[in-house]
Amino acid sequence: MKNFHLAGIIPVHKNDFSFGFEWPDSLMPVASRLTAIERSVMECAWAGCETIWIICNDDISPVIRHRVGEMVQDPVWLRNMDTHPSMSRKPIPIFYVPIHPKHRDKIDCFGWSVIYGALSIFKIAVKMSKWLVPGRYYVSFPYSVYDPKVVRPYRKEISSPKGFCLSSDGKTIRD
């Protein structure tokens, strides 16, 4: 496949205010100066995603956009020892996709956000360029609590046209 593109999907569920704070649970800190959504963005970057798409409602999108931003640097391409380190960096754009109003509060769950996000990404990418059409999707849930660098050794397998699934103790999501 000549133009393989890996798109990262991060679903942010609207009804995730279970801790009682004014902000979504995806903005809860999981480490010093690191929120759950930022951890998920970094996981997508370590996995080799060329674009990252955050699927969230319009009401929480500005807060998440303010914290996360509109791009992240590919951590593999951060080379501080180059003569011009800023020239060798590879930015990864972050896009925000709102859930359609007819689906809000009716079909509002993580599974639907992933499916709706993949469909929206495909529709948008087809209209923009054939080089942006994803060959595969990498889904990162913001409520996973593990080091995002754990996917780095599998970057080549994740970024290939062949299907890939992480496992823990010999079990995958399929089990």
Tell me the role of every PLM-derived stretch.
Residues 3-5, 49-51, 134-135, 160-161:
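A general structural motif
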Residues 4-8, 21, 28-34, 61-96:
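Short acidic, glycine/proline-enriched helix-loop-strand junctions
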Residues 51-57:
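Short internal beta-strands
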